[in-house]
Curated annotation (Swiss-Prot):
This is Flagellar hook-basal body complex protein FliE. It is found in: Bacterial flagellum basal body. Keywords: Bacterial flagellum. One of its GO terms (biological process) is bacterial-type flagellum-dependent cell motility. Its main location: other. The gene is fliE. The keyword Glycosyltransferase does not apply. GO terms for molecular function: cytoskeletal motor activity; structural molecule activity. GO terms for cellular component: bacterial-type flagellum basal body. Belongs to the FliE family. PANTHER family: FLAGELLAR HOOK-BASAL BODY COMPLEX PROTEIN FLIE, PTHR34653.
Length: 109
């Protein structure tokens, strides 16, 4: 008999806690800051930076090929590797975004 009373008391406590939790005012979400960029803007900026890195690497390689003074082979190789790494990182981000989109689209409604 005491187990039944204990169970009922626990159920009443759980219900009261549930009611308290539901009665509490939910915090209002702050609106997005006016100056904060959106996700698409941030993504376009990242792609733009990768493009700039690729173009700078190509320009440096062309300058080295024509024998322009002040352009060292090590600088060309470093710029080339920076461009390669940034492009690979962008590709991985794209792959993860596509995978996330596919996962969301395959979720049952």
């Amino acid at each position: 008999m005491s187990q039944g009373v204990e169970f009922n008391r626990l159920m009443l406590e759980m219900r009261s806690m549930q009611m308290e939790a539901m009665a509490k005012a939910k915090p209002v979400q702050a609106p997005a800051e006016a100056g904060a960029p959106s996700f698409s803007e941030m993504l376009s900026q990242a792609v733009g930076k990768v493009n700039e890195t690729q173009q700078a690497s190509t320009a440096m390689a062309n300058a080295f090929e024509v024998g322009q003074s002040g352009v060292d082979l090590t600088d060309v190789m470093i710029a080339s590797q920076k461009a390669s790494v940034s492009f690979q990182a962008m590709t991985q981000v794209r792959n993860k975004l596509v995978q996330a989109y596919q996962d969301i689209m395959q979720m049952p409604v």
